[in-house]
Design a protein with these regions (language model features):
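Short acidic, gly/pro-rich beta-turn/loop elements at beta-sheet edges
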Residues: 20, 56, 65, 92-94
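Structural motif
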Residues: 26, 50, 100-101
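Conserved short beta-strand elements that form part of the metal-binding/catalytic scaffold
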Residues: 29-71, 117-130
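Vicinal oxygen chelate
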Residues: 4-13, 44, 49, 67-130
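Short, extreme N-terminal leader segments that mark the start of a protein/domain
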Residues: 1-33
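Generic "edge-of-domain/loop-turn" microfeature
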Residues: 15-17, 53, 62, 89-91
Length: 130
């Protein structure tokens, strides 16, 4: 059912500063700088050997900002999530929905800041009870 660790998500308060810090630590530049208009967040991606690291920060009003801003205020910059990959998100949803209420698939999109290029995916947010 789960096929990979797709990526790690680090919530940061200052995306530009964190980008510079991780750039120095990894010795590589990010491959993507974008925004999630529907969530109100901005992000930067660093490609690693078989996964990637996503830095995400509050930017504008939206559910993503509403979720991560209080976490950053409480914990500072921190590991906020692990995205797992699957070949069949609908099957995963079906199996989880047998025991957990409110499991829904949400479309996601990031728009690259300079070129306007888009990345799209499906997300299945798991409740905090797990």
């Amino acid at each position: 059912m789960i096929s990979s660790v797709d990526h790690l998500i680090i919530a940061v308060n200052d995306l530009d500063q964190a980008t510079n810090d991780y750039k120095k630590n990894f010795g590589i530049s990010p491959c993507w700088k974008g925004r999630h208009n529907e969530f109100g967040t901005r992000n930067v991606l660093f490609n690693l050997e078989n996964t990637y690291l996503e830095l995400i920060s509050p930017h504008e009003d939206g559910p993503g900002t509403d979720f991560i801003r209080p976490l950053i205020e409480r914990k500072g910059d921190h590991l906020a999530g692990i995205a797992l990959g699957t070949d069949n998100v609908e099957l995963v949803k079906e199996n989880l929905a047998k025991n957990i209420d409110g499991v829904e698939i949400t479309p996601g999109q990031s728009i690259k800041e300079i070129e306007g290029k888009k990345r799209k995916w499906k997300t299945l947010f798991l409740p905090n009870i797990l």
